[in-house]
Amino acid sequence: MRKLLAGCLALCIPALLTAQTPADSISRTETIDSVVVTARRPLMVYKQTGNIAVDIEQLKYAPLFAGEKDIFKFLQLLPGVSAGKDGMSGLLVRGGSNDQTLILYDDVPIYNQAHAYGILSIFSGETVQSAEMSKGYISPAYGSRLSALTQIRTREGDRRNHRQSLTVGTLSLAGTLDGPIKRDKGSYLISARYFFPEAVLAIADNAVRYGFYDVTGKLTYDIHRNHTLSLGIYSGDDHMKNKEDHAENGFGWGNTTASLRLESRWNDNLRSSVVAYYTYLQNRQETKFKDDGFSNWGKTTFKTHEFGARMTFDQRLSHIWMLEYGAAFSHQRFEPMHTKSIINGQHKNRGYSSEQLVSGALFLNNRFQWGGWRADVGVRGAVYDNSEQTKYAVEPRAQLSYDFGRDNSVWLSGTINSQALVQFNRYYYSMPIDFWTPFRDGRLQHAWQVSLGGRAKLHENLTLSVEGYYKRMRNLPLIYDSDDFLLSNGGFIYGTGRAFGIEAMLQYQTERLSLTASYTYTDSRRRSDGVTYPFEYDVPHDFNAFVSYDVVKRPGRKHTFSLNVAWRSGLPYRLTNESYPDTDGNPIIGITAYPTMRMHNYFRADVSYNMERCKRNGVRNWQFSIINATWHKNPVSIYPYRGSYKATVLIPIMPSVSYTRTFGK
């Protein structure tokens, strides 16, 4: 079977030769207009203990954010995973914070996955090939985070045909080109998009201007029949400006990544993968003021650089024993704050000393598989050096599972993880302008987790998965005021954490209908200075459901309706409850160190209608979506207002439309 274009297939069926017939004796031929092969895959598939893969094909039917497809919105549907605030692109897993989830984009660490202040992620739906999350057993090949591993992979270009696609959304424009470099030997892929809400803001006579762009590229080439080389790049940037009378303020942030990978097949039992990468994150803030002969310009930047490499070998020692082993290295440099200013022509520079972290790791995993049994036993040994201290970590990991038959299995796992990085929240919740720093005071963060789960096929089309977990964390750094921390260059306040919960996911599949529903009960706590309190993203009850139905399904044409519903408990919140005057007598509002209340429960319903049609030279697709169709007001923050309090709502009702045209076979 050869794929020609999304939604259309060319089927080549070999004929079995049973007799010889002269060609000139064949009286006629029959041409079949089309052959339709239909099958539905579940939205999410459990691969092993606590590890879930997302079906990227379903992404094109999901409701759009401002006309954009976002894989992170799918990942946030997973049980045990939360976005944090409404509309955010965070991945908070099993009582962990966003910085405790390792996000890899083609094996390159990503330090800021947000566009549009977190409403969208940096991963374009046009380029993503696969997305997997590990929140139970994590391969020893990966470490440096406490909670989870998320791997996003970019698809390769087509090796036989050149293709082009153009997508016009409500506030965005995207284009993708891919095709062969040399037929059946190599391919290229380049994709770019631009988000331009400033057009709407200008019509509304708003002083705020905002937009973002990103570019993704990938080259793949078989330098030998057993060796494939690939080069991947990504660059993206967000910018926002606000003009008022004599002043102008701006924010911005961006990622740049590059990776070079060599995959080799040495023989039937040995394969290897070597990747070298670079990742860069910069956040910036800029102010301008000019009035009555006084002028002021200032710019503050925060930067994170990382160079790294990883070598992995997969070796089959026998029909029941597979070995995975290798090494990893990284060098990170953090520039926490550098300020340039010009005041009435006088130049001033101020910066804090940069910090660095050098990390190395060796890892080994033994996989045994016999009958229905499967066992993984591995260990990761890591060393971290921050120029002042060197710390070592040994992380054993193990899992055991038994498969009773198709879609019926049980599993048990235990993991130990360590982390040497800390993400600063410039405010008391995660924002794209946060920055990173290495461990201090000789303390690495540590966590251990045990989980037990199973999957059962209740009916031909109905599957239920259930998993429970218990996790402990220690040496968690708590920072209440990042500016004071930078000024004093001091240490952290440390605490401990505990989380447990049970996760359930129900999936129902027919030829036309796909339903995935998940429920999570969890209890996440933190303890510091003798006080135990709810984790700021603790959500005791969390329910998500995604359903898609093919309203029209016939050769060359498909209409799909989809609905996504989310309900969860309100988040704990640190209420501003006191104020004190500054030197000019203006009130400064204080924020408590611990949550003192919970916000209202969260609810959101998103709907979408997708119309896809195959053309002679490609595919045409229209998609209409409404985010928060019920216009439910979900607060993201609370602030004092005239002796009382008001809530800030980020996501109102958001209708959008998207048109995609694909050309090529």
Which residues are covered by each model-predicted region?
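Short, acidic, small-residue-rich periplasmic hinge/interaction motif at the N-terminus
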Residues: 20-63, 98, 265
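Periplasmic N-terminal accessory/gating domains of Gram-negative outer-membrane beta-barrel systems
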Residues: 47-99, 107-138, 155
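Structural signature of Gram-negative outer-membrane beta-barrels, strongest in the C-terminal barrel
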Residues: 318-322, 328, 351-472, 518, ...
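C-terminal beta-signal and adjacent terminal beta-strands/loops
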Residues: 566-585, 600-604, 611-665
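Transmembrane beta-barrel wall of Gram-negative outer-membrane proteins
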Residues: 171-196, 205-239, 250-278, 317-323
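Outer-membrane beta-barrel signature, preferentially recognizing the C-terminal barrel domain
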Residues: 246-265, 302, 353-357, 416-473, ...
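Surface-exposed extracellular loop regions of Gram-negative outer-membrane beta-barrel proteins
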Residues: 239, 282-284, 338-342, 388, ...
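Gram-negative outer-membrane beta-barrel transporters
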Residues: 470-472, 492-572
